Amino acid sequence: MGTQYFGIQQQLNDGIRGLHLNITQGATASDVSLCYPDCNAYNGGSLRDTLTIVKNWLDTNQRDVVTIFLESALLKASPAAVLKAFADSGADKYVLMGKPAAAWPSLESMIGNHTTLVVFSDDAGLVAANPKGYFIPHPNTVLRLDGPFTYGAEWTCGPWNRRYESILVIPHYIVQTATYNGATYNNMPYPFNLGTTNGYQFEFHAITCRGGQSIWINFMEVDYYSEGDVKTPTLKLNALPYPNDNVANFYPQFFDATVEVVG
């Protein structure tokens, strides 16, 4: 069962800039599949095909930055197969090479250098096996807060002590135990009550957890982003205007907004 109702192309067109991809060994040693939690429950196709979509999208959207979080399954894909998927898709030409030793580059410099694809991996073996250094180690860089949650549970914001992480990720989605194709799985998507989960609770969770951390929010992880309204609070968190908004709407209304002609 997928965690979104739309494919990668539509997600990017809709403004999604962070992609969480669960990778596992494919049918052959040179293949990498996107499955969650395994390919019996859900098979989302090949990593190469998804990376090709991302690469083609970046070709025509050169002022956008996309981030991919690679999460390895129990049956880990071989590092050589993952590298091959990046090379065969052409996505490797956009990848930011490794975590900067000091500060992260500005978005403007990344755009200018055409390094607009950032890739994190939780697999130390994959990070070590990559001679080009474009898989950034997830545990050393990303502070991922508590989650996921079950329905009715309180949103929490630990851990509270940042060590050296510079990227803040807040998981905001609900999971359940469910049976697919005769097998029972934990931490499966919960596609219910999304108007609430992806509505006011999204903004409440973000603001509450931001107040207890020393770094700004970089990513909110959500399932079924197209349900509810995560766009409006995301614009607010980024201090961006709403669609079709106008700066004149923020002027103080001391007088009627009319102009009289004097002859």
Language-model features and meaning:
Residues 1-262:
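Catalytic cores of phosphodiester-bond hydrolases, prominently lipid phosphodiesterases
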